[in-house]
């Protein structure tokens, strides 16, 4: 699996992964449906968003792995769906789902968040069962489809978002001689 090889090679910098973030950002802003040749970036971003330890961190036992690694939880729920959270009583089911919908459901369970916006940005289309399962979780408010290694390293080192303290002001004027022009 390419995810594990990138995990072994990545050094918490954007230039140490085997895909280009520019290509990932192009995909998540394109509105296109369907898979991407940069899908490794999608899996990697889930790791970046939900795993707090550094890439080289090892854990003493499977319980610690499940607690700290999203793909350990995804694997656990794929093997035993009865372990998956169901806060509003909607149980996880994988029956009849295609591979994309299985992944979306498992990721929602593992993150305990509705992460469908993330997958939609990556071109996946959730079915009705996936939407119903995901809707019982709070929506992921972070734009995790923009996360990169350096942002995660910043978070791991105790950094926090400055978004709440930043104010942005802009002024626009319509050109009187050319109404289609705004400056």
Where are these regions (language model features)?
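Beta/coil-rich, acidic/histidine-enriched accessory regions frequently appended to metallopeptidases
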Residues: 95-183
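Zinc-dependent metallopeptidase catalytic helix centered on the HExxH motif
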Residues: 1-30
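Extracytoplasmic/secreted envelope proteins and their assembly/folding machinery
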Residues: 2-5, 40, 104, 116
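Detector for Asparagine
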Residues: 1-2, 14, 55, 68, ...
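Generic, well-ordered alpha-helical scaffold segments in large soluble proteins
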Residues: 4-7, 46-49, 118
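Non-catalytic carbohydrate-binding regions of carbohydrate-active enzymes
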Residues: 22-102, 108-111, 124, 140-141
